[in-house]
Structures are given as C-alpha cells and as structure tokens.
Amino acid sequence: MTSGAAAAGRTPTWKERENNKRRERRRRAIAAKIFTGLRALGNYNLPKHCDNNEVLKALCREAGWVVEDDGTTYRKGCKPPPSSAGGASVGMSPCSSTQLLSAPSSSFPSPVPSYHASPASSSFPSPSRIDNPSASCLLPFLRGLPNLPPLRVSSSAPVTPPLSSPTASRPPKIRKPDWDVDPFRHPFFAVSAPASPTRGRRLEHPDTIPECDESDVSTVDSGRWISFQMATTAPTSPTYNLVNPGASTSNSMEIEGTAGRGGAEFEFDKGRVTPWEGERIHEVAAEELELTLGVGAK
C-alpha cells in the first residue's frame, strides 16, 4: 500500500512503514476469512489466490447480473449497446432497478463558453459557438451571446513598449533629488536629526548636524522650547564649550546671565519657570572641569 508520504515525493519514516504493513496484514487476514466463508458456506467457486474482483463477480452472478471479462456488468437480457457499454449511462434503462439519469447539463447545449472564445485568427473555432441557437434556452437573453464578437485576450502582453512606441526612444527622465536645497523639507531627515537650541530658526542653510551628540535627552528636548539668544555660529551641542573653551563665549554669557537672574529660573515660552533637577547643566563652569584622556590625575 502506498502511503500519502511516499506519493508526495518523500521517503516515509519507519513508523509509517510499520503502520502500512500492519494495515496490509489486517486487510489480507479479513479478505482470507471472507473468501473461506464464501467457499465453505456460500458454494462460491473462487480460485485459491483471488482478489476482491473475483468476489464481486461471484456476488453479481448470484444476484442475476452478467459480468464480462472486461468488467462490463448488466442484468441478464438487458445488454447495453456497444457504444455506451464501456462508458457512463446516457439514459434510463428499462430493465434496471435503479434509474440512472445523465447529467442535467448534457441535455441542453450551453451557449455560454466556459473559457475564452477562440480568436478570429484561430483555425479551430470555439466549440461553444452555435450558429443556430436553440429556442429552448433556459434564459432568453442568453440566445444572443453566441453572436457576440470573440474575445481577444492575450496572456503574452509585452512588458516593455515596442520600438514603434514614441516613448521607447525617449525614456522618461529621472528627477535628481534635491537633497542640498532644503534638507528639512523631507520628514524622514527631520526626524532623524537631533534637536538643537537653534532649531526654531528657519535658516536658508541650517547649521551642520554634528555626527556625535553626547548631550542628555532631557536637555535636548528642553532646548526646543527655551528661547536662547545665540549667534548664527552657535554650536548645536550644549557640551561643546566644555571640550572647546576657545569657542564663542557669547552663548555661555547669555545662559549664565539668564541663570543669574532670579536664581534657578529660565525663560519658557515668554515666561519664567523653575527647571527640575537634571536640566541645570550650564551652571558648571569650564574651568571647574578637568578632562583627562587616558592619563590618571597625579
């Protein structure tokens, strides 16, 4: 017995082979018992090594049916014509106990094609096109369908335009992206850029974004709302003056003056607010910090 795994193209496992052998042994044991009972009690003339077909033939002969060598089965005295003997029944047999009807679709020729109609250039017309449509159609409006022009459907349409096409010799020009005109026009670039205190001013050519911004996240976010008065060359990172004391000191003086007025308050949207702990990063002077690069303090 061939299992589904072997039919799929893969080798069955040892467990599947054992199950197949077990089922085959069980089937043969049951068939042997049936054959033994038919020979002993039913007076059936069955050969020693027979299969299920021999049993079916014997049962049909006992019921009054005739089974020929090629498998054609019919009642005695009601032999079918030779044309339909090997195929399916096309009508009702007056001698059969069960009336076998043909398919309903075979009684009326269908005027509607079940596939695309043949093109006009084809040498074999579509078999579903009827010259004289029958008046016994199920639906009246289907009578005019055979008179419709054939469908011109092609599944091999060219992907590229032909040489005669006006666009074949002149391919469309690809527009060059204007990355250098206004980088903040593109939303994905603006999202990826870090926030800076000078972001509120829309310049024609904005400052270059530093590659490594080591500022704190809260400081960067708070810089969006604080109104800093800085020069056009102000650095974008709040910690820039800590590593470069020689930079412009105008922005540090502005921030220190703002922090000096009113203690720990700063301007927020034209008002005075008190910052929380973590925002006071500009109170540390540059001379109070000692930067060492891999050298321990002596």
From Swiss-Prot:
- The primary location reported for this protein is nucleus
Region of interest (PEST-like), ranges = 204-224
Show the segment(s) annotated as Disordered.
1-25, 71-129, 153-175, 190-217
Q: Which UniProt keywords apply?
A: Brassinosteroid signaling pathway, Cytoplasm, DNA-binding, Growth regulation, Nucleus, Phosphoprotein, Repressor, Transcription, Transcription regulation, Ubl conjugation
UniProt keyword ATP-binding present: no
A single MF term (Gene Ontology) = DNA-binding transcription factor activity
Similarity comment:
Belongs to the BZR/LAT61 family.
Query: What other facts are recorded?
Result: Plants silencing BZR1 are dwarf with erect leaves, and have reduced brassinosteroid sensitivity and altered expression of brassinosteroid-responsive genes.
Name of the protein: Protein BZR1 homolog 1
The encoding gene is BZR1
